[in-house]
Amino acid sequence: MAFRATPGRTPPGPGPRSGIPSASFPSPQPPMAGPGGIEEEDEEEPAEIHLCVLWSSGYLGIAYYDTSDSTIHFMPDAPDHESLKLLQRVLDEINPQSVVTSAKQDEAMTRFLGKLASEEHREPKGPEIILLPSVDFGPEISKQRLLSGNYSFISDSMTATEKILFLSSIIPFDCVLTVRALGGLLKFLSRRRIGVELEDYDVGVPILGFKKFVLTHLVSIDQDTYSVLQIFKSESHPSVYKVASGLKEGLSLFGILNRCRCKWGQKLLRLWFTRPTRELRELNSRLDVIQFFLMPQNLDMAQMLHRLLSHIKNVPLILKRMKLSHTKVSDWQVLYKTVYSALGLRDACRSLPQSIQLFQDIAQEFSDDLHHIASLIGKVVDFEESLAENRFTVLPNIDPDIDAKKRRLIGLPSFLTEVAQKELENLDSRIPSCSVIYIPLIGFLLSIPRLPFMVEASDFEIEGLDFMFLSEDKLHYRSARTKELDTLLGDLHCEIRDQETLLMYQLQCQVLARASVLTRVLDLASRLDVLLALASAARDYGYSRPHYSPCIHGVRIRNGRHPLMELCARTFVPNSTDCGGDQGRVKVITGPNSSGKSIYLKQVGLITFMALVGSFVPAEEAEIGVIDAIFTRIHSCESISLGLSTFMIDLNQVAKAVNNATEHSLVLIDEFGKGTNSVDGLALLAAVLRHWLALGPSCPHVFVATNFLSLVQLQLLPQGPLVQYLTMETCEDGEDLVFFYQLCQGVASASHASHTAAQAGLPDPLIARGKEVSDLIRSGKPIKATNELLRRNQMENCQALVDKFLKLDLEDPTLDLDIFISQEVLPAAPTIL
């Protein structure tokens, strides 16, 4: 049986009550040694892995439970083709005992599961397929199931809100398929009671943690990183009616590298971007092709291949229509052009060096079956006539019977004119004219114009004719001659159409029998299209080939550039990076605002990413070591639906890095801690960095850009070779601050916030007051409140008092200074002091 239903609940058996920790039971005495003096060790139960998977709209959600460590592992939503190659790699790597999924699945997933189910009776045995109702995988019910779970790693003292915040830092709730897979897995575990089959029913399946799962050959990058590095960026399309989603690719890395000529090339490039890899053989094979097309003597070949690739169309959709017998005339045209373009690609690649694997694959796998398909279509299909009649028609000399019927059909109008003249001779003299017409499916009819006296239905009756119907003031009849024509000629149009449809079906069978070749053509052609696009971008932007070295841990870049910023700026200052050893694993970068710190962080991340997808990079030289993940905390991706503050989102991003980063990970942090009190933010930043530094050689490669100069001044980080302090070089020219955008050793002396405020257009009095308060804080002096209006009134009162003094005539004998002071000066004192 291909699929099994989920078994019923296991009856509760004897066992400890829930809530009593295992440590509360007395430890059993060790067993006595046997006669041989050797103690028998308890055999460890074999680990079981139970996988839950969902596939929808080209994306895959995966979660599995490992009984060896009682941990649930999940993989964020990942794109996967209908062939489900990614799912197959997951199955090969984790080798699950069971695969849990929804009973309501797509056709591609159903075929894949059917194939898996057929392996259950083979050796080695395949996984058990378990189908659960689709309601168990609902998004909301799955989310509530996750949030309401009883987990031993969450303290009972946590409130419901704190629990939600904690779980949101571990589980990507924005990945809908992953959340649904996790919810379905929890439902399956509670039904099967994995590991607690013999315990009381109130004892739940132990879950000791949630961990992110990444295939060994892939590099882990979350959606926040894709967004802040501008690897992908969607924006509104100006002509919304032209595109289904209303979105187009904005200024992004994908946007500037996507020069693919066929749709499937664009899909493959996006797939490569979502799956950066560590397989050196695969990466070098991509770079070999790019390097070949960058040679000046191969430019013409690259342009010719690009032209051929523009004719490679959506073959799978055409094959699907053929299977459903819904083929259009345009499908035959598209398939014909695609196959002939594929033959052109094959002939071109056979003249290229066969030492490059892609050229060898195209030369060998684009077999003569393609020529057979193209020859069949070209010899059978009459494209000009098919477009005119909007249906499938065949060329002459394919079927003699069809040709004969078409000749008769062509000569039919003149023949019918002669028949109509004979019919008119036998009609009433009041009928001025008639015609014999042919209507498919009905046959030959005599058409007579309606006369004025023909009002009632009884007036339509004519002796010797059978009335059929009235249409557009013309009466249609069957006569003896039209009946004879039906017998002699038959329904020519329908017969021709039926015979041509039969030929089309036979041609479809010939094409479908070679569908695997066409699918392989699409795979290799799209791969060639992507590499030609990357080569074109590398040529135009001056990229160089990266080198991969498993010996170094990190990256080394000489004169690297930001691939997007250099296109927007008139001049761009390159900077180098060296984090390829055990020294300087944590780089603290200080400098004024707008000095280029954030651009440098993104530059390091983008160059590393480009190397991991097999692209040339914007640098003079780049050496990439072992990188397993890229984490970022650069920009807060806010959303009302998340229900989290900006600072909480920042903390979640840092928590992902702290919980998952290894010694092979790249972590980019920009201005962490600015979303809360400066003291608390500084303390959190220092605590995170000290946590990583305490790992020693296992510390990830961390780049931190910060304006917290106290981090250095207060020596909050331990001194040692793991920490390296860098700054963006600047120069003060009078009151102006000149940015050199050059990274150098050292620490910034000041933040120069007043200069940045002036650039932003703040009024000068505000900037002056800010500098005054800053100086008072540094010197430890009290800050007095100030009011510009009060100060202006004081000046006016002082001026008025001075004017009174100037008007005094000190030589006047009647002047009494005591009266002047008591009446004029002393009352004004409170207004001027």
Curated annotation (Swiss-Prot):
Q: PROSITE patterns from the entry?
A: DNA_MISMATCH_REPAIR_2
GO biological process terms, semicolon-separated: female gamete generation; homologous chromosome pairing at meiosis; meiosis I; mismatch repair
Q: Which CDD domains match?
A: ABC_MSH5_euk (cd03281)
Name the domain of life.
Eukaryota
Is Nucleotide-binding one of the keywords? Answer: yes
Q: What terms describe the molecular function in GO for this protein?
A: ATP binding; ATP-dependent DNA damage sensor activity; mismatched DNA binding
Task: Please give an example of a GO cellular component term from this record.
Answer: synaptonemal complex
Ranges where the record places region Disordered: 1-45
User: InterPro entries in the record, alphabetically?
Assistant: DNA_mismatch_repair_Msh2, DNA_mismatch_repair_MutS_C, DNA_mismatch_repair_MutS_core, DNA_mismatch_repair_MutS_sf, MutS, P-loop_NTPase
The record's comment on protein family reads:
Belongs to the DNA mismatch repair MutS family.
For this entry, the protein name equals: MutS protein homolog 5
Q: Which organism is it from?
A: Mus musculus
